[in-house]
Every structure is written in C-alpha cells, then in structure tokens.
C-alpha cells in the first residue's frame, strides 16, 4: 500500500484487528521510508443479486428503494432508525446468503414483511396492504387476525 504522506510503495503492518462486528479489518501501518503511521480499513466487496421483477424485468438491487419502502411503512411510528438500518442490513445478508445471482422481487417483499412484523405491527399492516393489494376492509381484518395468532 502506498504511504499517504510520502507516496512510498513500501509499508508494513504493525497491528491488525477485526472491527464492525467482524465485517472489517482495521490495520495500523507504518511507512518504511518516512516512518509515518496511518490506519486502513478492509471490507470485503460483496455483490448483491439482481432483482427479477414480476414483469420479468431484471434490475440491480437498489438499497434506497428498500429503505424507502421501510420508511413509508414506518412513517410516524416509534421505531429507531438504527433498527431500520439493522433490518436492511439483515435483508442484504439474507440475499447474499442465497448464493444466487438473481432473486425474485417477491422474495425481497417477503423479507421486508418478516422484518416489519418484528419491528412494528402497524407498519407491517401498512406494507402488507400495498404489497398484497388489499381490496377491502375484510382483507385488513384477516391479516390483523393472523397477526394476533
């Protein structure tokens, strides 16, 4: 790795440790030329699968679209933004764990519903009503009854 101070090519690692719940490696380095020390972080570059939409169109996974869906369902609900971010990261981990290059959008929708069910039941019903295209109040009642079981 190049030294950020003198641009020398040679640096040595003084210390390495896992950080960020084991998802990053923090390395303390020292330049062998100018002896300056600096810190680097290594993260695995993980690619998320492409999404197959219901009309068979394929598109890249869009984390902002996922976040937007969560935030719409959770609007004015008492859920911490950290909890939302943890749910999003968990869904991304589940998608990577499939090992598939492409996943159906329906799978992502179901993962969101599972996460919302744990985070906030009202947000779950909001999301389910749009995701499952509820037509009348009876469908709301049936979904609420399932939640109470």
From Swiss-Prot:
Domain of life of the source: Bacteria
Single Gene Ontology BP annotation: negative regulation of DNA-templated transcription
Gene Ontology molecular-function annotations: ATP binding; DNA binding; zinc ion binding
Domain ATP-cone: 49-139
Co-factor note (free text): Binds 1 zinc ion.
Signal peptide extent: none
Keyword terms of this UniProt record: ATP-binding, DNA-binding, Metal-binding, Nucleotide-binding, Repressor, Transcription, Transcription regulation, Zinc, Zinc-finger
Known cofactor(s): Zn(2+)
Zinc finger (unnamed): 3-34
One Pfam family recorded for the sequence: Zn_ribbon_NrdR
PROSITE patterns: ATP_CONE (PS51161)
Its job: Negatively regulates transcription of bacterial ribonucleotide reductase nrd genes and operons by binding to NrdR-boxes.
Family statement: Belongs to the NrdR family.
Protein name: Transcriptional repressor NrdR
